[in-house]
């Protein structure tokens, strides 16, 4: 279990690296981490600070270097700057190579969620190129990944809770597995509703839905 409180970058990258190693040792092919796991979801306005954003990319670079020899795909969450905007993203990588960066499409701005203060929606981004950790990689919301013969798509938290979820398009394009990075808080009665939602999304997309 990965804690999502605080912004201790030097601890977070090592913790994530350790979990990726454990996953590889246990024979896992893909490991999914929570939304914004590198910085934590609860950074508040600190998430916009250049120092924190720089540290996040450095942390990703450390993880890439430390897991380069491991035969496992990892999906982590982190804030990413593209152009003049900040996006809540999933980064897909394996053996030191970044395969793509997926921005969150639907940005919640209600109750305890106020992401619109910090993040832009990735809805208008079709497919672009972004440079991270010295690598040029794809950046877009409806990417389909094919690693090791397995086709999969990625969306982030709120993206699943809307009628036109990105995963629907990814499934039509051939995704066999759909991954959702989330950092939703525990609320009384929410778990059962969430379980129903995940089952429904899996049935609608005829895929394995990993949340």
Q: Could you tell me what each predicted segment is?
A:
Residues 58, 85-173, 189-197:
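Active-site catalytic loop in hydrolytic enzyme cores
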Residues 23-46, 75, 96, 159, ...:
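Active-site beta-strand/loop signature of hydrolases that rely on acidic residues for catalysis
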Residues 14-28, 167-168:
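Short amphipathic alpha-helices and their capping/turn segments at secondary-structure boundaries
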Residues 45-53:
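Short glycine-enriched, charge-decorated loop/helix-capping segments at active-site entrances
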Residues 1-6, 11:
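Single conserved hydrophobic/aromatic residue that forms the stacking wall/gate
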Residues 77-80:
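Short beta-strand-to-loop element that shapes/binds the nucleotide-sugar donor at the catalytic cleft/hinge
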Residues 54-75, 155-211:
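CN hydrolase (nitrilase-like) catalytic-core segments centered on the catalytic cysteine
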Residues 26, 70-74, 84-86, 138-139, ...:
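Short, basic and Ser/Thr-rich N-terminal targeting/leader segments
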């Amino acid at each position: 279990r990965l804690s999502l409180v605080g912004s201790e970058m030097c601890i977070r990258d090592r913790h994530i690296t350790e979990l990726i190693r454990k996953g590889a040792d246990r024979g896992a092919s893909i490991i999914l981490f929570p939304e914004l796991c590198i910085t934590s979801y609860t950074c508040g306005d600190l998430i916009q600070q250049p120092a924190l954003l720089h540290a996040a990319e450095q942390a990703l670079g450390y993880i890439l270097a430390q897991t380069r020899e491991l035969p496992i795909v990892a999906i982590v969450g982190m804030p990413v700057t593209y152009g003049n905007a900040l996006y809540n993203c999933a980064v897909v990588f394996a053996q030191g190579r970044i395969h793509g960066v997926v921005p969150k499409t639907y940005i919640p701005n209600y109750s305890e969620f106020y992401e619109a203060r910090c993040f832009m929606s990735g809805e208008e981004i079709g497919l672009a190129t972004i440079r991270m950790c010295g690598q040029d990689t794809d950046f877009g919301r409806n990417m389909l990944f094919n690693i090791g013969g397995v086709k999969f798509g990625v969306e982030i938290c709120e993206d699943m809770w809307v009628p036109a979820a990105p995963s629907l398009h990814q499934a039509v394009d051939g995704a066999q597995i759909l991954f959702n990075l989330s950092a939703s808080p525990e609320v009384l009665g929410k778990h059962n509703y969430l379980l129903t939602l995940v089952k429904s999304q899996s049935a609608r997309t005829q895929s394995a839905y990993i949340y």
